[in-house]
A protein has these predicted regions:
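Nucleotide-sugar-dependent
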Residues: 87-90, 142-146, 154-177, 186-198
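Nucleotide-activated donor-binding/catalytic signature segment of Leloir-type glycosyltransferases, i.e.
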Residues: 106, 115, 120-150
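Carbohydrate-associated surface elements
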Residues: 42, 60-61
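A charged, aromatic-enriched C-terminal amphipathic alpha-helix characteristic of glycosyltransferases
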Residues: 210-217, 227-259
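A short, histidine- and acid-enriched strand-loop-helix "catalytic/donor-clamping" loop
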Residues: 1-16
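Conserved donor-binding/catalytic core segment of Leloir-type glycosyltransferases
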Residues: 71-92, 96-99
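Membrane-proximal helix-turn-helix segments that form the acceptor-binding/catalytic region
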Residues: 7, 17-36
Length: 272
């Protein structure tokens, strides 16, 4: 069984007359599962405490067969590809405003936002800033992979609002793996104690801004270190991705786990 979101905790938000039924059904799934996986270490800890069963983290794998590009665009291209839910549009808006200020005398960097989300007039006003930020609409996944590969900095964001933080606290966005697959520097913007942001802090090839008040100073510093961006990407991020997320590694681990479970079941049958 794979736990991608805190479904059990979310039952509290369901109508009261369905809560008992849903909890019992979920508890049955946990009880009958021979192996439990979760999307993040934080989710593993949470469900181990709830159900007193071991839970292992299982991350999405990525294809690292192509070499990262060895140059920076002019201006620096920052790419966000994903949804705008859970207040992520507000975080992107703060980044866009910081870039507008940085670009006041010369265009240093531009943010491109690829999303299939419905664009309201308010979102358009916040995120379409001439010369600094642009909503590019949706694209097929294969095209998104190429766009991210040709970027300089790929972006993952979370909201700083308390309500939104609680909703994504234990979740791990698979978009982070797409960012790693691009071979470019990853920039995470979001509060501490969120699973996805804490994970990015572990990666030597990633930048993290976890204080919205420092976004202008932090992004300015990052953009001023162009040579460092290239070195950081090649040495830190790519090595981390190969060790932890390369598709063959993830598949081999899953294969070993399934083989072990099958052997265990076979031995039980013989014993009976």
């Amino acid at each position: 069984m794979f736990i991608a979101d805190d479904v059990y905790g979310a039952i509290d938000n369901v109508a009261w007359y369905r809560q008992c039924y849903l909890r019992k059904e979920f508890e049955k799934c946990i009880e009958y599962s021979d192996k439990l996986y979760a999307v993040s270490e934080e989710m593993c800890e949470l469900y181990e405490q709830r159900f007193n069963k071991p839970v292992e983290v299982l991350y999405k794998g990525c294809d690292l067969s192509t070499e990262p590009k060895g140059f920076l665009n002019e201006p620096i291209k920052i790419v966000y590809a994903g949804n705008l839910y859970y207040g992520r549009d507000d975080t992107l808006a703060e980044l866009a405003k910081a870039l507008e200020k940085i670009n006041s005398t010369k265009t240093v960097a531009k943010l491109e936002i690829y999303t299939g989300a419905t664009i309201t007039s308010e979102i358009e006003r916040k995120l379409n800033i001439v010369g600094s930020s642009e909503i590019m609409g949706s694209r097929p996944y294969n095209e998104i992979k190429e766009i991210m590969k040709n970027a300089d900095i790929v972006l993952h964001v979370e909201s700083f609002e308390e309500k939104q933080k609680e909703l994504v606290k234990y979740s791990f966005s698979t978009k982070i793996i797409d960012c790693l697959q691009s071979g470019n520097v990853v920039l995470g913007i979001g509060p501490s104690n969120i699973a996805s942001i804490e994970y990015l802090k572990k990666i030597d090839g990633a930048f993290v801004i976890d204080d919205m008040d420092n976004i202008f100073d932090s992004i300015s510093k990052i953009l001023n270190e162009k040579n460092y961006i290239k070195r950081k990407c090649k040495k830190g991020l790519v090595n981390f991705a190969k060790e932890n997320h390369e598709l063959t590694v993830v598949r081999e681990k899953l294969k070993e786990d399934l083989t072990t479970m099958c052997k265990g079941k076979s031995n039980e049958s013989v014993a009976n």
